[in-house]
């Protein structure tokens, strides 16, 4: 059965799942090239100069990014959620509707992994090279990638809440 919920805009959405080792290795190479582009684009805004560096535990995020870079080719399955249509020239309403629908699907997918002992994270850096990834996987150019999700067994199941800003700092 279907494991993901969809929003009101239920146009064509798909989860492209890849478990072929050679293809995953090529995907990892594209991801790492895109990460190099991202790092170059940040310029001096890295390390302690990064905007998020003041968030408690932010060094763990950097460590996780580096670990994923080094081990992405070893992940059992990589998933790219896609939806039909491009948002670049769409109205704000249509953009929000398209993204709002795929976000529900992806979040449901990630929650469905948990009781199976699996986990993932939402990565977007490959989008610097979305066309290259699409060509590798045969994804039509009129589909938008919503991210890249490495899927693997978790190390334990004792997940804890992450640090969050106090609610009075985020509500207007």
Residue spans of the language-model regions?
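Short, surface-exposed beta-edge/turn micro-motifs
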Residues: 12-13, 75-78, 145-146
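N-terminal amphipathic, basic helical "cap/leader" segment at the start of enzyme domains
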Residues: 1-72
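C-terminal helix-cap and adjacent tail motif
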Residues: 144-172
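Short, electropositive alpha-helical surface patch
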Residues: 131-146
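Small-aliphatic-rich amphipathic alpha-helix that forms the alpha element of a beta-alpha
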Residues: 1-3, 79-135
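Helix-biased detector of long, well-ordered alpha-helical tracts
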Residues: 46-50, 63-67, 77, 82-93
